[in-house]
Regions:
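Conserved Radical SAM active-site core
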Residues: 1-77, 84-88, 100, 112
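A general structural detector for well-ordered alpha-helical segments in enzyme core domains, enriched
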Residues: 7-8, 39-43, 66, 102-106, ...
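Hydrophobic faces of well-ordered beta-strands that scaffold small-molecule active sites
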Residues: 21, 54, 78-80, 117-119, ...
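Alpha-helix N-cap and loop-to-helix initiation/capping positions
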Residues: 35-38, 94-102, 161-169
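A structural motif corresponding to the C-terminal end of an alpha-helix
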Residues: 46-52, 105-117, 171-180
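Conserved strand-turn element in the central/C-terminal portion of the radical SAM core barrel
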Residues: 96, 106-129
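Auxiliary Fe-S-binding modules of radical SAM enzymes
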Residues: 125-180
Length: 180
């Protein structure tokens, strides 16, 4: 992947139809090594220089390092995955991800910089109902999805969280978050 900026620079002129580039819906673009290699930053610079729309999704407050590019680009938006308001729950399901408070703070800083922001509450974890108050005024939109990974059901059972797998939990929490 170290040649990603070079490939992007070469491929963009070949594209006749513009579509938003999702950076990155599958693999976090701000993993710890990004601090050293700066590949995401280079790719964002290339996209911005070519007026190419981009949607950035991460769990990492490292996205703030690139706030200048994101803010000044013509059509960029940035979002953070925030699956619960409860950091103890985060530790069970996302033990290596940044704390919830840091992600909320990053959303706030991005939003105050005039950047379109969103929260990705997917998968919705126990404690997500507390996100409404934490996210209010910090996002322009929200994406919500339930826990669809049945291989994770054992974690719910082990810690007595089965109620959060129920349809009622999803619909009740979705309604609370929809008010944003």
């Amino acid at each position: 992947k170290v040649n990603a900026p070079e490939l992007l620079r070469r491929e963009i002129p070949k594209k006749k139809k513009r579509g938003a580039v999702w950076v990155s819906g599958v693999c976090d673009p701000y993993q710890p090594l990004e601090a050293k290699y700066r590949l995401t930053r280079q790719c964002l610079e290339i996209l911005a220089q070519n007026n190419w729309p981009a949607i950035i999704q991460t769990r990492s407050p490292l996205v703030l390092r690139d706030i200048d590019i994101i803010r000044d680009a013509r059509d960029f938006e940035a979002g953070l995955s925030v699956t619960t308001a409860d950091d103890e729950i985060r530790k069970l399901f996302e033990p290596h991800a940044p704390p919830i408070e840091q992600r909320i703070q990053a959303l706030d800083e991005l939003h105050r910089a005039g950047i379109r922001t969103y929260a990705m509450v997917a998968p919705m974890l126990p404690g997500a109902e507390g996100l409404a108050e934490l996210l209010r005024g910090k996002i322009d939109s929200i994406i919500i999805d339930r826990m669809n990974y049945h291989y994770a059901d054992w974690v719910y059972r082990k810690y007595g969280l089965e109620d959060s797998l129920a349809d009622d939990f999803f619909y009740r929490t979705r309604q609370a978050l929809a008010s944003l």
